[in-house]
Swiss-Prot record:
Disulfide bridge partners, by residue number: C78-C171
GO biological process, one term: lactation
Localization per record: Secreted
Source organism of the structure: Trichosurus vulpecula
NAD recorded as keyword: no
Tissue: Mammary gland. Secreted in milk.
Protein name as annotated: Late lactation protein
Signal sequence coordinates: 1-18
Length: 176
């Protein structure tokens, strides 16, 4: 009888903790973050998914908004990307504003300072979701990765469309 009780108790415990990864208020600390893994939910051209990623710097501005900065190489030119991040009425979502404005969902993992950002993107008239695991260093945290894979499985992302971008140093734009 005790074995049956413990089996049921452990099953319930694992079920209750299976959803540790939940949409939550996006409240990152200021600092440097790294995109560790990227997944897309539908067919998407490989060349459209970033293969090399520089560190992402998040800063809080005086008006309460956040700014994210990173650099990327495109056609052998370095481009600095600045994105404004604003909280929405739904604390689990943020709007990102650069050229286009779109709303992303934030998912907190079980590891501190590790987030999954899920952003929609229009491509050839279809909405594609892109999920990115973001962490405070280049070392991949096994628990955060486990949370990421559990999340993309739950959200029905295709496991064949997962990319681990190469971490690169930030480049210096010509105008800087």
């Amino acid at each position: 009888m005790k074995v049956l009780f413990f089996t049921i108790a452990l099953s319930l415990f694992s079920i209750l903790h299976a959803d540790d990864v939940a949409f939550s208020a996006f409240t990152p600390s200021e600092g440097t973050y790294y995109v560790q893994v990227i997944a897309v939910d539908k067919e998407f051209p490989e060349e459209e998914i970033p293969r090399d990623m520089s560190p992402l710097t998040i800063m809080y501005l005086d008006d309460g908004k956040m700014e994210a900065r990173f650099t990327m190489k495109k056609d052998d030119n370095c481009e600095e990307i600045n994105i404004m991040l604003e909280k929405t009425a739904d604390p689990r979502k943020i709007t990102m504003n650069r050229r286009l404005r779109y709303t992303c969902a934030a998912v907190r993992t079980s590891k501190q300072k590790h987030w999954i950002l899920v952003c929609p993107r229009e491509f050839q008239g279809e909405t594609i979701r892109m999920a990115k695991l973001v962490g405070p260093n280049t070392d991949k945290n096994p628990k955060a990765l486990e949370d990421f894979y559990r999340f993309i499985y739950r959200e029905r992302f295709d496991k064949r469309r997962i990319i681990t971008p190469k971490q690169t140093e930030a480049c210096a734009p010509e105008h800087a």
